[in-house]
Amino acid sequence: MKRFLILTPMVLALCGCESPALLVQKDDAEFAPPANLIQPATVTEGGGLFQPANSWSLLQDRRAYRIGDILTVILDESTQSSKQAKTNFGKKNDMSLGVPEVLGKKLNKFGGSISGKRDFDGSATSAQQNMLRGSITVAVHQVLPNGVLVIRGEKWLTLNQGDEYMRVTGLVRADDVARDNSVSSQRIANARISYAGRGALSDANSAGWLTRFFNHPLFPI
């Protein structure tokens, strides 16, 4: 018991010093251009009018459908959710003991009553609304056997008070790509869209270690 009383404050103190999740770093290899495009291609003499890399049919447009092709993702995300919960319950017990009688005498000292009552009432309300508008240019990193494009890309903005980054990954059907090589973010399957930042502005929106300590799930109050 003594050891428990000593370890509990230490654990709570460490919870308050817990660091937030590490932010992503620049120059991530996962978001680099496809490796097979970095290797120099063999130069072939095809004449001045014909280039194998840019060959396409007269009935075919220049939409992105090959590894390394570039397309623009139009970000149009809007979510809204709300939830409300309420719980209440109560329990009440009453028990009375009559005065026993022995040889015609009542033993008043042994009489009495016991009662107990417990009540709980809790309620919670949660509401969240998110909106993201903009655009980001990504590259095709893989073409699946069924023609679905695996896209991936990032954008970093270095500002006076820190950095902001945006990352998009997911699967896109080639048929959903418009003629101007753009696609809506709502057409991306398994989409992973990240928009965050780091620096002075981001630190100002982060809770300090003492606030995290009191808001930690292990805090008893």
Curated annotation (Swiss-Prot):
One of its GO terms (molecular function) is cytoskeletal motor activity. PROSITE patterns: PROKAR_LIPOPROTEIN. It is found in: Cell outer membrane; Bacterial flagellum basal body. The basal body constitutes a major portion of the flagellar organelle and consists of four rings (L,P,S, and M) mounted on a central rod. GO terms for biological process: bacterial-type flagellum-dependent cell motility. It comes from Yersinia pestis. This is Flagellar L-ring protein 1. A lipid is attached at residue 17 (S-diacylglycerol cysteine). Keywords: Bacterial flagellum, Cell outer membrane, Lipoprotein, Membrane, Palmitate, Signal. Belongs to the FlgH family. Assembles around the rod to form the L-ring and probably protects the motor/basal body from shearing forces during rotation. Transmembrane segments: none annotated. GO terms for cellular component: bacterial-type flagellum basal body, distal rod, L ring; cell outer membrane. The keyword Membrane applies.
